[in-house]
Amino acid sequence: MRIEKDKELMNILKIMAPGTPLREGLENILRAKTGGLLILGDSDQILKLVDGGFKINSEYSPSYVYELAKMDGSIVLSSDLKKILCANAQLIPDSSIPTFETGTRHRTADRVAKQTGAIVIAISQRRNIITVYKGGIKYVLRDSSIILARANQALQTLEKYVAVLDRVVNNLNILEFKDIATLFDVVTAVQRSEMVMRIVSEIERYICELGNEGRLIDMQLSELIKSVEEDGILLIRDYCRSNMEYEDIYKQIQGLSSEELLNLDGLSKIIGYTGVPLVDTLISPRGYRMINKIPRIPSNVIENLVANFNQLKCVMEASYEQLDNVEGIGEARAKAIKNGLRRLREQIMLDKV
């Protein structure tokens, strides 16, 4: 459900993450301080720009790439990264393509990437950095230790944000069962949920860039967030105006800037409440989020329940017979729903104490 930002960049980072044969070859060139220019792709459009060099047509290996980079020209790899096609080749892109790069190697890489849409990697001999180009994208690969430090810092921040979200949601749970939740409580929970998901997106990018070195970070992340996004979406479904699509609302919230996300009035407008006081407006949940917490209740049954009763309070007050009349709910499921909601309420009230 998250909008896939920088999807192309994420795919590039996966290809050359630490632990991959390509990254190993790049690191070898970097350590040797020879510099290098690699193009990933063997389409006719790319091969038309290749002039001279040696036809290698050999299986890819990090050590082969390292040895071939000692020559001045560029190295052309196949699209699947399984073969080295040629080495010591000269790339001749269209010189009218604008570029703001300075070094010859980087100017060529930028132009070839813009002209062909292929991934081109320039390794600087003096600055000792790896720069990746694709279309209009330019990205400097960072050392794993730097990314790891940033990922750990982001995890610590996430931990604090999740703790605040838990407090806000637990408070909302109590208010929902008492049917005294206000627009302020709801919008605060939506805001906090989105804040957490933004940090998660940042950590996921670090994990992608770390490759096999990011496994522990990934495990810690999974443990921390569990069902945060799902609960956030159900929260929107519980409280948005009935004539609005919850998916569109979720996308709108994701599109907000950091400053806009801090504006609770703006968030309340997005979920359909315009010109009403946040603290004084009482709203009742439909029950999607709470009923979802009851085990073994299918989503179609939850949809039918909400369509029939429209409010969590009405579901809780309904008799076994009234629940039984809902499509997909028999006597056993009616008991499971009643008992499940009762246990949930008791648990939430105990947590408060």
Swiss-Prot record:
Role: Participates in a DNA-damage check-point that is active prior to asymmetric division when DNA is damaged. DisA forms globular foci that rapidly scan along the chromosomes during sporulation, searching for lesions. When a lesion is present, DisA pauses at the lesion site. This triggers a cellular response that culminates in a temporary block in sporulation initiation. Also has diadenylate cyclase activity, catalyzing the condensation of 2 ATP molecules into cyclic di-AMP (c-di-AMP). c-di-AMP acts as a signaling molecule that couples DNA integrity with progression of sporulation. The rise in c-di-AMP level generated by DisA while scanning the chromosome, operates as a positive signal that advances sporulation; upon encountering a lesion, the DisA focus arrests at the damaged site and halts c-di-AMP synthesis.
Organism of origin: Clostridium botulinum (strain Kyoto / Type A2)
Disulphide linkage map: none
Residues bound to ATP: 73, 91, 104-108
InterPro entries linked: DisA, DisA_sf, DNA_integrity_DisA_N_sf, DNA_integrity_scan_DisA_link, DNA_integrity_scan_DisA_N, DNA_integrity_scanning_protein, RuvA_2-like
Keywords, alphabetical: ATP-binding, DNA damage, DNA repair, DNA-binding, Magnesium, Nucleotide-binding, Nucleotidyltransferase, Transferase
Protein name: DNA integrity scanning protein DisA
GO biological process: DNA repair
Any one Pfam family match given in the protein's UniProt record, by short name: DisA-linker
Residue ranges of coiled coil: none
EC category: transferase
Sequence similarity: Belongs to the DisA family.
Catalytic reactions of this protein: 2 ATP = 3',3'-c-di-AMP + 2 diphosphate
EC numbers for this chain: 2.7.7.85
HAMAP family: DisA (MF_01438)
GO MF annotations in UniProt: adenylate cyclase activity; ATP binding; diadenylate cyclase activity; DNA binding
Quaternary context: Homooctamer.
Domain DAC: 6-144
Cofactor(s) essential for the protein: Mg(2+)
